[in-house]
Swiss-Prot record:
Keywords: Ribonucleoprotein, Ribosomal protein. This is Large ribosomal subunit protein uL13. CDD domains: Ribosomal_L13. Part of the 50S ribosomal subunit. Gene3D superfamilies: Ribosomal protein L13. It comes from the Bacteria. The keyword Ribonucleoprotein applies. This protein is one of the early assembly proteins of the 50S ribosomal subunit, although it is not seen to bind rRNA by itself. It is important during the early stages of 50S assembly. GO terms for biological process: negative regulation of translation; translation. GO terms for cellular component: cytosolic large ribosomal subunit. The keyword Ion transport does not apply.
Length: 142
């Protein structure tokens, strides 16, 4: 029996919506990364993007455990000497709700062209409304 390998043209992608209200950041991110890769499907193939589209609503109501609200730090650099910026999870959630979730999921996906294609299937919204109702997304409980 030959090993099955999915073809990019044959992949069927579903749309799912996740309500992140009072959900823990890492638990949501790991499940989302798994579904973006397509590892939940029997036809998963490592070198083919077999994942689904994921819509996350209420990303502003995401939470972290313990004291990570103040202790978890995110860094970025301007490219100039001494140009490092540091922010906490709490400040990032206030200014850019959902960016912490996007960064967490992106870190769990493969690096390279395949990972970049996978992260494009993630749609994060701070509030409960999203513009993807035409795709008739199924509700996904985590």
């Amino acid at each position: 029996m030959k090993t099955f390998s999915a073809k990019p043209a044959e992949v069927k992608r579903d749309w799912y919506v996740i309500d992140a209200t009072d959900k823990v950041l890492g638990r949501v991110a790991s499940e989302v990364a798994r579904r973006l890769r397509g590892k939940h499907k029997p036809e998963f193939t490592p070198h083919v993007d077999t994942g689904d589209f994921i819509i996350i609503v209420n990303a502003a109501k995401l939470r972290v455990t313990g004291t990570k609200e103040q202790d978890k730090k995110y860094y970025r650099h301007s490219g100039y000497p001494g140009g490092i910026y540091e922010t906490t999870f709490g400040k990032m959630q206030q200014r850019f709700p959902g960016r912490a979730l996007e960064k967490a999921v992106k870190g769990m996906l493969p690096k390279g062209p395949l990972g970049y294609a996978m992260i494009k299937k993630l749609k994060v919204y701070a509030e409960a409304e999203h513009p993807h109702s035409a795709q008739q997304p199924k509700v996904l409980e985590i």
